[in-house]
């Protein structure tokens, strides 16, 4: 997330079509209220507080899907996919019961997404020592 005029912005790869809808659906299923900062139902797309690298990279092209791994490679950003990828998460969760492995996978995706945003802005990528993981 980044702040803009003291407002939070959520950032992610395909966050508008996967992450945020998934989180909101899970909230409803569990009888929880959707927080105002995630309720985009009556908002215009440009009024949402999201930075979506997937949407940005499309440039209006809706024919193709570009994975985070492919976008990272195209932008010269180191790939986070050195252990598992999204297709393996369910197996790691249900069969291995290894939440720590999934958490590390997600943390790497966050850093990669952040570096892609920095690359879009022609800024220097984060160095490993600049990344702090809060547990």
Where are these regions (language model features)?
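Noncatalytic, basic helical substrate-engagement surface that gates or grips nucleic-acid strands
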Residues: 1
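C-terminal accessory domains and tails appended to enzymatic cores
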Residues: 132-135
């Amino acid at each position: 997330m980044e702040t803009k005029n003291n407002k939070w912005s959520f950032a992610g790869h395909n966050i508008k079509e996967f992450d945020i809808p998934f989180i909101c659906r899970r909230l409803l299923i569990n009888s929880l209220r959707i927080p105002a900062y995630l309720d985009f139902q009556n908002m215009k797309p440009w009024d949402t507080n999201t930075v979506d690298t997937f949407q940005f990279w499309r440039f209006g092209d809706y024919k193709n899907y570009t994975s985070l791994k492919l976008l990272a490679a195209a932008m010269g950003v180191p790939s986070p996919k050195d252990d598992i990828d999204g297709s393996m998460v369910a197996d790691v969760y249900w069969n291995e019961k290894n939440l720590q492995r999934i958490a590390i996978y997600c943390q790497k995706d966050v850093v990669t997404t952040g570096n892609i945003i920095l690359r879009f802005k022609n800024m220097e990528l984060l160095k490993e020592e600049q990344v702090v993981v809060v547990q």
